[in-house]
Amino acid sequence: IIQTDENNYRTLGSYLECLQNEQAFPWGKEAVVETPHIDRLAHQGVLFTRCYATSPVSSPSLASFMSGLYSKNNVVWTNEMVLSDAAVTFGESLRQNGYATGYIGKLHLNGKGRPEWHPRRDFGFSDNRYMYNRGHWKKIEETAEGPTFRTDADVKSTDEQTFPTDYFTTQAIEFINRHKEGPFCCMLCFPDPHSANLVRPPYDTMYSRIRFKEPATALTDTTGRPAWSHGNNLKADQHEDMAQYFGMIKCIDDNVGRILDALKGAGILDNTIIIFTSDHGDMCRQHGLINKGVPLDDSSRVPFIISYPAGMRQGIRIENVMSVTDFTPSLLSFCNIRPTTQYDGRDLSLLWKGEKLPEKYKDIVFMRAITPKIKSDWDESTTAMRTKWISAVTPEYKLTYSEYASDVPWLTDLKKDPDELVNCYRDPAYKEIVSRLAADLKEYGEQYNDPRIKHPKIQQEILSAILKK
C-alpha cells in the first residue's frame, strides 16, 4: 500500500486520461509530470476517478483510511491527535490472520511526537522500525540507534540513499524480500509531495524549463463565494514551487518503479495487491489556494488505484464515489477476512473486482472540515474557524454547508461545472437535488452523531431545503 501526502490527482498521467483538456492541464499543456509506473498500475488494475478524503487533512484522513471509521468514532478530528485504542486497523486484522505487517514512513496518528521514530504503539504493524509520527524533513541518516532526520540539512546535500522517498522505498524493498514466501502487508507512506516544496537533485531542476500558467480558477472573482474558497498566502511567482512539486511527484513515480521491479524480481508481482493513493490533495493554486482543508476537488479528491493482475480485471475506471473510510472494510472483504468490529465505511470490494453494486446502494460520500482545537471530547461549541464546513458528494453533485455566518450553502453540478465556480443551490431546476442531498446529510449526521449537522445555522438550512422538496 503506497500512500503519498498532499498529492494533487491531476499530476498523474492515468488521471489526466480521465479528464477533458481544460481540466487536465490547469497549469498549461506543457506542465505534465511523466508517471509511467503509477500509470502502469492503473492500466493493469482499477482506477477510482472520484475517491474523497473524509476530511482533507493528514491525520483525520489517514485515521479513517486505517480504521474504517469516521472522525467521531476514531477520535481524530484534527492533526496531532491519537487514534482511538478501540479502532481496529486493517494492519491489526491482517496480522491476526497470519500476515507479516510492516509500516514504513509517516504515520501522523500518535499525537504531537515529532518525529518520534518507531512509536511504542504499532497500530497493527509488527515491524515499525521505520515508522515515524510526523514531520517533513529532507534527509535521513542511519545511526546506532536507528534512522534519524537531519533537520538542518540542505536538500541539495541529499541523494538516493538519504532522501526520504528513496530511503523509505529501500526499506520497503527489504521488507518485501524478507517476507516474499508468505502473506505480507507493507504500508509505505511517503511524506512527499507535501510542502515545503523541495526535492533532491536531479529532480529539483527537471521541470524548471516549464513556465507554469496561473489556473483559470485563480483569476475568477470570489465575491459572494464562501469563506472556505478564498485565497490563502499565494506567492506572486508560482514557478519554483510548482517545478519542485512536479519533481517530488517524479521522484515518487521512479520509486514506485523500484518497488514493481523488486516484486517482479521476487517472483510475486502478479500475485500481489498493490494500492496507490494519497491522504488528501493540494490546491496547487487552483481557486487562488494552496495546500488543503477545503471541499474543492483539488483538496479533497485523492488518487486511488488498485492493481492485482492475478485476481482482477485490468484497465477498469470506476465512476462511483469512494471515501477513504471505505478502504479498510473493502480491503478485508477483498482478502476474505471476516471483520472483528463494526465499520462506518462500506464494503466496495465488488467494485474492486469490476462488478456492480446492489441496486439499493446509495452512491454518496460525506466530508467535513477539521475541528481546529484539540479537546478532551467532541465539543465544538467554543471553536471558531471560517472553514467549518460539511459536504455530501455524489458522482454528479457536491453540496456544502458552512457554519460561517455569511456563507451561503453551495451546490456544484460537477458534470457541467467541474471548476466548481457556479452555485446552483437556489436554482429552481436543482430544488429536488438539493432536498435529496440535504436529507442524506441529515441522515449521515444523525447516524454517526456528527455535531456539525447540529450547528443552528446548518441545521436550519438543511431542514429548510428538505421542506422545500
Enumerate the language-model features and the residues they cover.
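Residues forming the ATP-binding cleft of Hanks-type serine/threonine protein kinase domains
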Residues: K415
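Formylglycine-dependent sulfatase
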Residues: I1-E403, D407-W410, P418-A439, E443-E446, ...
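A short glycine-rich, hydrophobically flanked beta-strand micro-motif that places a catalytic Asp/Glu
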Residues: H455-P456
